[in-house]
Amino acid sequence: QPMRKGPDAAFSTEVANAVVMDSGRPVLFVPYIGAGKTLGERILIAWKDSRESARAVADALPFLKDAKAVLAIAVEPRDEESVQDYVSDKAVEGFLRRHDVDATVNRMVAPDIASGEFLLSRAADFGADLIVMGGYSRPRLSRLVWGGVSNLMLESMTVPVLMSH
């Protein structure tokens, strides 16, 4: 997890961004508090119908196949501008089924709180010891500007997060 404060804070965020965006590999971020006693037994998938989410789920298959419980959450946006980013949760459900991953897939309307905070809350409620998600950047802006959920997860994660781009 990047440093939140101090002279290295900006550098840490820049490095985290570059690693996810440019490595071509999944990246496992571990929170300041470290990983818990387990890793990958209870996995929450933050699903958005995008290349990044699909890549993250595919990259996480070794964890997903061995998990005791998997919960995929597809958050449906409230505002009309975001509707084009949302497609049915059936894509992730079908993929997981084809790979013999027993998962519960929930579609939820975006709550009034930020999506990242909502996902962290659901992860805590579920007892997740790993979150799987796509790493996003905002198109045509500085590579240092991450999407809101990706950035919030890096800053506030309470369990390890596997990100892919």
Indicate residue ranges for each PLM-predicted region:
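Redox- and metal-dependent alpha/beta enzyme cores, enriched for Fe-S-associated oxidoreductases
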Residues: D49-V101, N106
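Short, well-ordered secondary-structure micro-motifs
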Residues: G40-E41, A56, E81-Y86, G116-F118, ...
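Short, small-residue-enriched loops and turns at beta-alpha junctions
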Residues: G6-P7, R78-V83, A110-I113, P139-R140
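Structural beta-alpha unit
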Residues: R98-I131, Y136-L144, V159
